[in-house]
Amino acid sequence: MLKASILFITISLTLMLENSYGKSCRSIGEKCSKTVFDRCCGDSICHLTSPFHGKCVKCLKEGQLCTSDKNCCSDKCNWGKCTKEKHY
């Protein structure tokens, strides 16, 4: 019961904060911070240029930092960077 209450309160606070900031997500080309309060819409990703400062892009180019294959234009994320070559 306590876990459910904490989860409900967390979700409620997140939604209230999101609504107080206006738009709930950013479009391609708009500024983002890669946080729940300032995230990119849909499949776009926040390309950070410094901590919490970036721009929403369709995908990350070769050499940029990534967390998964779907972040990269090449669909290949190897050791945290987008690559051209397939990793094995």
Curated annotation (Swiss-Prot):
Coiled-coil positions are none
A single Gene Ontology CC term: extracellular region
InterPro entries, alphabetically?
Answer: UPF0506
Query: Which superkingdom is the protein from?
Result: Eukaryota
Q: Does the keyword Thylakoid apply?
A: no
Q: Which residues form the signal peptide?
A: 1-22
The subcellular location is: Secreted
What keywords were assigned to this record? Disulfide bond, Knottin, Secreted, Signal
S-S pairs: C59-C73, C66-C77, C72-C82
What does the domain comment read? The presence of a 'disulfide through disulfide knot' structurally defines this protein as a knottin.
Q: What is this protein called?
A: Uncharacterized protein SJCHGC09803
Which organism is this protein's natural source? Schistosoma japonicum
